[in-house]
C-alpha cells in the first residue's frame, strides 16, 4: 500500500505546485498544431518521454520481456489499433488537393458565392476510387469509378459525390461463402442480380464499356448522378445535373491490358496521378451543369429523378461553370485520404436537394457508414473534414472530442448568452430552403417513367462506335462467361436482347447459351459525347508515357534525337534496356529493363535502328528476358492499339514479334505504325499518333457485327 500512496502524494504535490504559481493564468495546452514534422527530431513516447533504446526491456540477455516496459506496451498497443474499418464501398482510393475557379458570375441561377466571383480560388480535395474492391485491390479492375470532390467554400463545405445502392453492392461484391472474386463482377451472383433487376442494365453497359477501365484518373469524366436544384437570391430555382469534363480528354484500357497492368503495377492509377502532379502536369477538369427549368422537368421520356438515367447532351448541353486544377499530393495518406468523409448532404447555400429516391437514401447511409468507420460523431473535426469557416453550434462531447468549448450555454434559444450562437435568416445569408409542394400517397415499387429500363441502355450502345461495341461484346463474353450458372448466363443474355438483338446474339455465342430472337426494335437513336473514341483530344502529348527500346549496338543518335523531341513536348520517356543505369555513347541512362516494365504501362513505343546483332540479341532468349519480353513488348503494344514508331532495322523486332507492318508507310500509319529512318519527320508523325491514342481499326470484328449508327471521327482541339 505504501507505493501507491507515494504516487498519489506526488500527483497531489504537482497540482499544488502549479496552483501556487505566481502566474495569474496558465496558457492553454489545447491549442495544438496538427502538422507533425519528424525529420531532425528525437524519438519520444506518445507522452513525450524521450526513448533511449528501441529494444524490449528483458530480464538478462535471454530472459523474458518485462511487463513494466511501458515503451514496448505503448508501441504494440498503438500498432494493434492503427487500422480503421475500410469503406463499405469505394475502399480503394487516391486523393489530391487543388482549387476551383468559376468562369463568371452565376448568381442568376445560384446563390452559392463560390460560383459568383471569377477571382476566387476555392480549395478542393478530390478522391478517385473504385467501388467494389478492398483497400488492397488493384487500380485497373473493371468497375464504376468514384469521383468525390469537396469544395472548402466561404459558406461551408460542399461535397459532390456518387455511390450505388446496397443490394447491388452485395451482389457485385465477393460471394459470401468463399469471398471470391475480389474487385470484380465476373461471377454468378452479380449477373443474377443484374438480370433480376433490369434497372441496372444501363449502368452495367457503362461499366463493361471502355469507361469501366480508364487509362488514367486524369482522363475520366465525373457525374453527379443525381438531379439537384440551384436556387438564387430571388428564390428562383432550376434543376441541374453536374458533370466533370477532363481537359486532357478521355482514354481507356482494353481488358487484356488492364489485367496485365494489375500484375505489373497494382498502384498504376495512383502512381500516374502522383507523378503528373509532382512533375507540374496538373490534371484539369471543367465543372459543368445541364440546366432544366422547373417547367420543363416533365417534358422528357425519362424521369429526371431517376438516378439510373442521364440527360442526353444532344437534348440539354452542358454549361461550363468553371475549372478545377489538381496541384498538390497529400502529405499523409491516412490522415487525409483515408479519414476524409464525403457526404451528399454536405451542401452550401444556393444548392439544394430533389426527391431523387436514391439521393434520399444516401443522405441517411453516409452518416451511418461514417459513424461506423470513425467510431465517433466528432469525425467532422478532423483537419481534412473541417470547413475553412468558423463552426458554432450546440453539439457537444462524444468520443475523441477535439474542441475545448467555453461558456455555460449549449442550447438554443437562451437568455444567458443573448441567444447565441444565433440562427441566420435567409436574407442575411442563412441557408436557402426550396418551398416545394409535396403531394401523393405512401407506396412502394417503381412507377411511371421509372419503369423504363432499356431505352437509355440502347441509346448508350448506339452511341458507341463499331469498334467500341466490339470491346463491349468481348467484355461481356469474359464477364458472363465466368458465371458458373448457365441459367444466369441465359437470363442475362435475354436482358441484353431487350437492348439490342445483335449484341445479345454475339454475347450468347461466346458464353454457350441459346441465341435469342428479336423482341424489340432498335431505332438507332444516338447522342453525343458518350463515345470515348470520338471525344475531343487536346493537341499535346504532355504527361504521355513513351518507351524507347534499346540494346547493345542500338543507334544512340536516334535514341537521343527522339528522346529530346518527346521530352521537349513534355512527354515522359523511359529507355528500356538489358540492365539499369547503363550509359550509351550519348550519356543516356537506361531507366527500365525488359524484366521491370512492359508496354502496358506506356502510351506509345519507339524502336530505333541499330546493328544487326542488336536485334539478334533482342529476338533471342536470354537471362535478361527469359520470356521473350522485347517481342511481347511490341506485340502487346500493337494488340492494345497503341502507336508504334520504328526506324531502320527496328522493323526486325516487329517482324519477329509478328506485328503487321502493312504494305507501304501510309497504310501502316493509318494503323498507328510509323516507319522512317528520318527521326525528325518520324517524331512529328509519332506525336500525332500519340494524340490519337488508340488505333482500334487493328481490332478484329465479329463476322456478324452490325455497323454502329455512330461512326468513328477523331477530333483534335485547334
Show the residue positions of the predicted features.
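Catalytic nucleophile loop
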Residues: 485, 604-610, 626-656
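Gly/Ser/Thr-rich loops at beta-strand to alpha-helix junctions
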Residues: 552-556, 650-652
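Active-site-adjacent core segments of small-molecule enzymes
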Residues: 20-553, 560-572, 577-596, 606-610, ...
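Short glycine-/acidic-enriched loop or helix-start segments at secondary-structure transitions
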Residues: 558, 616-618, 654-657
Amino acid at each position: 500500500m505504501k507505493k501507491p500512496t507515494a504516487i498519489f502524494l506526488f500527483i497531489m504535490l504537482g497540482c499544488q505546485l502549479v496552483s501556487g504559481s505566481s502566474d495569474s493564468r496558465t496558457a492553454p495546452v489545447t491549442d495544438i498544431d496538427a502538422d507533425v514534422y519528424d525529420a531532425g527530431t528525437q524519438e519520444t513516447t506518445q507522452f513525450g518521454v524521450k526513448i533511449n533504446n528501441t529494444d524490449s526491456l528483458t530480464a538478462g540477455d535471454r530472459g523474458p520481456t518485462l511487463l513494466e516496459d511501458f515503451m514496448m506496451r505503448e508501441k504494440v498497443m498503438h500498432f494493434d489499433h492503427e487500422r480503421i474499418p475500410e469503406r463499405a464501398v469505394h475502399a480503394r482510393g487516391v486523393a489530391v488537393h487543388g482549387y476551383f475557379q468559376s468562369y463568371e458570375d452565376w448568381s442568376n441561377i445560384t446563390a452559392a458565392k463560390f460560383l459568383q466571383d471569377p477571382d476566387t480560388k476555392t480549395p478542393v480535395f478530390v478522391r478517385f476510387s473504385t467501388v467494389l474492391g478492398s483497400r488492397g485491390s488493384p487500380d485497373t479492375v473493371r468497375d464504376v469509378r468514384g469521383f468525390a470532390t469537396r469544395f472548402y467554400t466561404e459558406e461551408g463545405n460542399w461535397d459532390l459525390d456518387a455511390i450505388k445502392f446496397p443490394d447491388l453492392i452485395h451482389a457485385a461484391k465477393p460471394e459470401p461463402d468463399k469471398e471470391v472474386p475480389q474487385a470484380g463482377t465476373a461471377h454468378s451472383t452479380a449477373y443474377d442480380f443484374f438480370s433480376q433487376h433490369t434497372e441496372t442494365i444501363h449502368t452495367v453497359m457503362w461499366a463493361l464499356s471502355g469507361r469501366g477501365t480508364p487509362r488514367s484518373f486524369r482522363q475520366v469524366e465525373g457525374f453527379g448522378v443525381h438531379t439537384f436544384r440551384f436556387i438564387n437570391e430571388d428564390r428562383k430555382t432550376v434543376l441541374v445535373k453536374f458533370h466533370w469534363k477532363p481537359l486532357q480528354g478521355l482514354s481507356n484500357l482494353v481488358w487484356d491490358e488492364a489485367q496485365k497492368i494489375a500484375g505489373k503495377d497494382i498502384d498504376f492509377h495512383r502512381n500516374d496521378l502522383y507523378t503528373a502532379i509532382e512533375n507540374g502536369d496538373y490534371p484539369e477538369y471543367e465543372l459543368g451543369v445541364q440546366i432544366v427549368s422547373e417547367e420543363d422537368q416533365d417534358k422528357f421520356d425519362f424521369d429526371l429523378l431517376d438516378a439510373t438515367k442521364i440527360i442526353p447532351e444532344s437534348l440539354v448541353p452542358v454549361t461550363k461553370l468553371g475549372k478545377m486544377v489538381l496541384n498538390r499530393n497529400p502529405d499523409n495518406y491516412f490522415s487525409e485520404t483515408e479519414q476524409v468523409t464525403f457526404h451528399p448532404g454536405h451542401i452550401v447555400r444556393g444548392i439544394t436537394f430533389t426527391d431523387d429516391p436514391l439521393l434520399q437514401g444516401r443522405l441517411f447511409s453516409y452518416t451511418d457508414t461514417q459513424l461506423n468507420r470513425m467510431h465517433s460523431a466528432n469525425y467532422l473535426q478532423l483537419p481534412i473534414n473541417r470547413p475553412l469557416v468558423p463552426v458554432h453550434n450546440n453539439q457537444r462531447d462524444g468520443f475523441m472530442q477535439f474542441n475545448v468549448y467555453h461558456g455555460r450555454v449549449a442550447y438554443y434559444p437562451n437568455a444567458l448568452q443573448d441567444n447565441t450562437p444565433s440562427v441566420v435568416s435567409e436574407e442575411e445569408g442563412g441557408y436557402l430552403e426550396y418551398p416545394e409542394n409535396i403531394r401523393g400517397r405512401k407506396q412502394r415499387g417503381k412507377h411511371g417513367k421509372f419503369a423504363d429500363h432499356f431505352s437509355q441502355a440502347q441509346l448508350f450502345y448506339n452511341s458507341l462506335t463499331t469498334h467500341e461495341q466490339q470491346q463491349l461484346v468481348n467484355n461481356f463474353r469474359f464477364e458472363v462467361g465466368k458465371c458458373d450458372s448457365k441459367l444466369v448466363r441465359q437470363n442475362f443474355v435475354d436482358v441484353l436482347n431487350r437492348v439490342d438483338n445483335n449484341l445479345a446474339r454475339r454475347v450468347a455465342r461466346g458464353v454457350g447459351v441459346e441465341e435469342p430472337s428479336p423482341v424489340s426494335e432498335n431505332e438507332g437513336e444516338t447522342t453525343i459525347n458518350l463515345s470515348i473514341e470520338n471525344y475531343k483530344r487536346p493537341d499535346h502529348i504532355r504527361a504521355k508515357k513513351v518507351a524507347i527500346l534499346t540494346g547493345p549496338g542500338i543507334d544512340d543518335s536516334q535514341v537521343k534525337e527522339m528522346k529530346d523531341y518527346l521530352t521537349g513536348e513534355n512527354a515522359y520517356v523511359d529507355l528500356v534496356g538489358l540492365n539499369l543505369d547503363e550509359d550509351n555513347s550519348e550519356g543516356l541512362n537506361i531507366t527500365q529493363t525488359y524484366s521491370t516494365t512492359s508496354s502496358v504501362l506506356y502510351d506509345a513505343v519507339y524502336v530505333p535502328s541499330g546493328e544487326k546483332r542488336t536485334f539478334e540479341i533482342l529476338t533471342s532468349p536470354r537471362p535478361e528476358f527469359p520470356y521473350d519480353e522485347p517481342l511481347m513488348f511490341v506485340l502487346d503494344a500493337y494488340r492494345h492499339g497503341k502507336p508504334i514508331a520504328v526506324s531502320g532495322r527496328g522493323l526486325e523486332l516487329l517482324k519477329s514479334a509478328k506485328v503487321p507492318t502493312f504494305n507501304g508507310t501510309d497504310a501502316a500509319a493509318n494503323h498507328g505504325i510509323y516507319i522512317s529512318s528520318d527521326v525528325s519527320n518520324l517524331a512529328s508523325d509519332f506525336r500525332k499518333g500519340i494524340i490519337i491514342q488508340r488505333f482500334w481499326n487493328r481490332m478484329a470484328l465479329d463476322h456478324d457485327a452490325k455497323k454502329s449508327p455512330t461512326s468513328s471521327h477523331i477530333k483534335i482541339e485547334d
